Regions:
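Beta-strand/loop substructures that line and gate deep hydrophobic ligand-binding cavities in soluble
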Residues: 81-137, 157-158
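K/E-rich alpha-helical interaction surfaces of small helical-bundle regulatory domains
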Residues: 27-30, 93, 99, 141, ...
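Hydrophobic ligand-binding cavity/cleft-lining segments
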Residues: 1-44, 49
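Glycine-rich portal/gate segments that line the openings of hydrophobic small-molecule binding cavities
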Residues: 39-86, 103, 108, 141-144, ...
Length: 158
């Protein structure tokens, strides 16, 4: 079984800035401070680009996790995809879409996450009862941090 969820965030900043900021290793690390997420291999600082890999180490549910992601799709400033190539999930695909807001006053960022938990039938139960909601909350927290930082960067300074 697999699960899919979508998170839509309006950010008052141009798509190019939102796109680039979304690929920042440092911003990702700061947004995931509660789980002590760190880049430990591959690209460990700066902006991720096409074909880049990064291995993240974190703690979720009190358990240490390692996940290596690949930037498998990249079309600046409209889209990128990260996929797990090694880690705790049977499958993890996270599509990031960026479009100019209808009022042209910002960017609509749409995250589409498709994942499958490990552990057979037990994983299916965990996926349905806990994991989907937990992961959506992580994306919401990350996006709130991204929104705050990006809007501060885009705001005119006197």
């Amino acid at each position: 079984m697999s699960s899919c969820f979508e998170v839509v965030t309006l950010i008052h900043a141009p798509p190019e800035l939102v796109f680039d900021t979304s690929l920042s290793v440092e911003l990702h690390t700061a947004s995931m401070a509660a789980s002590r997420e760190r880049a430990v291999a591959g690209v460990t600082s700066g902006l991720l680009g096409p074909g880049d890999r990064v291995t993240w180490r974190a703690r979720h549910f009190g358990v240490p996790w390692r996940m290596t992601s690949l930037i498998s799709g990249y079309d600046r400033p409209a889209y990128f995809m990260d996929e797990q190539v090694a880690g705790p999930f049977r499958r993890w695909r996270h599509a990031h879409h960026f479009v100019l807001a209808p009022d042209e006053e910002g960017t609509v960022m749409r995250d589409v996450v498709d994942f499958a938990a490990p552990a057979g039938p037990l994983g299916v139960v965990a996926e349905a009862l806990v994991l989907r909601r937990y992961l959506a909350r992580l994306i919401l927290l990350r996006n709130a941090h991204l929104k705050r930082i990006t809007e501060e960067t885009a705001a005119p300074h006197d």
